[in-house]
Amino acid sequence: FLKTFVKIMILYTRQEDTRKMKIVDEYFGCDVFSTSAMQRYLPHAVYKQMMDVMEKGKELPKEIADVVANAMKDWAMDKGATHYTHWFQPMTGITAEKHDAFINPTGPTSVISDFRGKELIKGEPDASSFPSGGLRATFEARGYTAWDPTSLAFVKEKTLYIPTLFCSYDGSALDKKTPLLRSNDALNKAAVRLLNIMGYNIHKIKTTVGPEQEYFLIDEEMFKERLDLLVTGRTLFGAAPVKGQELDDHYFGSLSERVKAYMEEVDEELWKLGVYAKTEHKEVAPCQFELAPVFTSTNIANDQNQLTMEVLQKVASHHGLVCLLHEKPFDGVNGSGKHNNWSFCT
């Protein structure tokens, strides 16, 4: 009887695990304007042209851009979105966004939802208040955001996020994404040329990376007691802790219910956004943890890491916690690195 009972319990557990996996499979990437979403919302001919743009770097004709923008708007509104934003990465260390509603007036008291190709492809935020790395004078305000079709748009908090580059009127990079894409292009040209000389019939190479995000979690009430943490995100003074990271007993230790619940919510939010959140565990220092994704193309991995850091900090407040992403928030214990296994492949 005992053997039969154990077999039944094992089978039941496997079925429960399978059901959970199917649920994740069903909602993974549900908030991303993925290729499957494009197939549903775009005419077949336009979808094929979009694939050429994304995979081969071809230009997108204006008339096609209008169709893509309208389809993207319809998909986002079906997800409950009311606004869109050009999401970019200026030289501030964080992302930037300006939200515009889809509505356009058609009369004194009426509006229509509209989103056109020119609004998808280009935006004009005021660049005078963003750092330029000394490229130009501070009074020069002109700056442009340009759609990056290789990184998929997504919906978050009722807003359609469109990944974009940020540059000046003469093409000078005012962000972190533009140099990254240019370096990828330079590496692609050089590597393809070398491989062709060596006899390999290669037409394109891409770089991949999987940044491991380390972070600290501390109680929100304790966080509020420290002005230095509130202002700078790190401690500036204080005594050494009673116990540090001696014996490394925190590393890979069992997770508390509070932290586990936090990690589960983080996973769910990231999976909805198509982020391959894979591995999570306790790190060496007390209260330090790590979230590692499956590697993907460098450009997408960079965008997803920005999302990961944002989600880690926002979800922490739901559990009475504060997430510290500073590289060295505490003296005498490990800081938070960001290991990334960079490579390139054909």
Regions found by a protein language model. Name each.
Residues 9-10, 203:
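Extracytoplasmic glycan-interaction modules
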Residues 10, 27-140:
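Active-site core of metal-dependent hydrolases
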Residues 18, 23, 27-32, 185, ...:
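Flexible inter-domain linker/hinge segments
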